[in-house]
Amino acid sequence: MESSRILITSALPYANGPLHFGHITGAYLPADVYARFQRLQGKEVLYICGSDEYGIAITLNAELAGMGYQEYVDMYHKLHKDTFKKLGISVDFFSRTTNTYHPAIVQDFYRNLQERGLVENQVTEQLYSEEEGKFLADRYVVGTCPKCGFDRARGDECQQCGADYEARDLKEPRSKLTGAALSLRDTEHAYLHLERMKEDLLAFVQGIYLRPHMRNFVTDYIEHLRPRAVTRDLSWGIPVPDLENKVFYVWFDAPIGYISGTMDWAASIGDPEAWKKFWLDDTVTYAQFIGKDNTSFHAAIFPAMEIGQSLPYKKVDALVTSEFLLLEGFQFSKSDGNFIDMDAFLETYSLDKLRYVLAAIAPETSDSEFSFQEFKTRCNSELVGKYGNFVNRVLAFAVKNGCTELSSPQLEQKDLDFISKSQKLAKDAAEHYAQYSLRKACSTIMELAALGNGYFNDEAPWKLAKEGNWNRVRAILFCACYCQKLLALISYPIMPETALKILEMIAPHSLDLGSQDPDRLQSLWTDSFFDYSEEKFSLKEPELLFTMVE
């Protein structure tokens, strides 16, 4: 039985910098498109996201910036929330891992894992700064590479030769912040024995959706699981109940943020127990959207943590991964100057242009590349030349000739064939959305626009108008507007603003959108939406949907 309740989460953006196009197309646009599609299907959707606000990268960069940790994450939490809004990401609640509910549930996860013998303490040697009076994690350490001798190697990897190692393996290790020499000291940490859950995890991943090319990677990762430290010597983080001066590793606490974020949402709507109907009900369908670099944590580690709990937390049903989006052949990097200012871009180009192109080139099974030339080509050829042209020419002709009120006319077989083909493409689009393929959905959108253009060209109503055959003209316009109604429906998850403009211009009488949130259209993708027999349209002066990109 198909679930009527859908839980959607996407990887929590790290509160350590602005989001770029790679982040958006990797996790947040796909999640938003899926959420919009499922709402159209009439499902009860909850899309949760939020900022990941702990970890060494945050403490180090906050200190380098001369800012307090909370001040630093507050800045990026607001920035990420604003970015979601600008990009039309219809998240239902944007929380953060510094929320009120997070510490208690993280500590509860830990205690449950301890009670089941899955977490054990172990003494290891780590680098200690006498001057600073604390252990230093790898990001705080520099030294001489044990492989090539480079004297400014990082604590986890040598940027000169590419070698990776433990920070304690560095020669002449020193503090990155003060330059003080470091020594080795014993310290006690808690380790999660993931290898003890290998068989459970292998069985689990066999039953979930993964992109085909990821399944072997995930299986191999689980086969080679080993214990992982869940604690760190830091002051910024969730305190560990039974280890003094320790906090939880960010990889341990961050995914629990999906649950605490849902608790945060429940409190915000005045129903503190509402989170349970999504996290403690196995009939819910749970889809998680992430970049490929987060796969191991979400396919193995977080499910292992859930398996070790006393409460039956919902585990993911579909783990939807994306590869990397490159910019002109290189990874997005603000520090290297290889990035696009998102605010400046959106001041120049419409949001739906960006959403469409990012969806059309989505790195679903392999890395893909964003280039301005492809952006320009797709906008001008597809959005202006095919899509916008179809909508504009039909409405302009209808308004010019006074055919603004259309109702179901007498149709010929070729009209019925056209309607049937249009319906088939709309149903194809639904299948693509259901299978998490933005690329195929974009192709189908353009295929439907091309079908409509072809029909309008072939039937040439302007010739019939000259002959005075207005009944036939109205029949052609009716069929073209019906096609545009379907085009708006299948476009909405990717281009919501454009879809709403089309529906406003053709004004199908079967729809009453006045009471709906335009960002969360609900229950439109129904059999009645596809029924044309009783449909009527009240056409308005066309508004240009897209302009050429110079």
Swiss-Prot record:
Presence of keyword ATP-binding: yes
Motif 'HIGH' region boundaries: 13-23
Any one GO molecular function term: metal ion binding
EC number(s) on file: 6.1.1.10
Cofactor: Zn(2+)
GO biological process: methionyl-tRNA aminoacylation
Location of this chain's protein in the cell: Cytoplasm
Residues binding Zn(2+): C145, C148, C158, C161
Note on how the cofactor is bound: Binds 1 zinc ion per subunit.
Motif ('KMSKS' region): 331-335
Catalytic activity, as annotated: tRNA(Met) + L-methionine + ATP = L-methionyl-tRNA(Met) + AMP + diphosphate
Keywords of this entry: Aminoacyl-tRNA synthetase, ATP-binding, Cytoplasm, Ligase, Metal-binding, Nucleotide-binding, Protein biosynthesis, Zinc
UniProt GO cellular component terms: cytosol
Reported function: Is required not only for elongation of protein synthesis but also for the initiation of all mRNA translation through initiator tRNA(fMet) aminoacylation.
Quaternary organization: Monomer.
Family: Belongs to the class-I aminoacyl-tRNA synthetase family. MetG type 1 subfamily.
PANTHER family documented for this protein: METHIONINE--TRNA LIGASE, METHIONINE--TRNA LIGASE, CYTOPLASMIC
Protein name (database record): Methionine--tRNA ligase
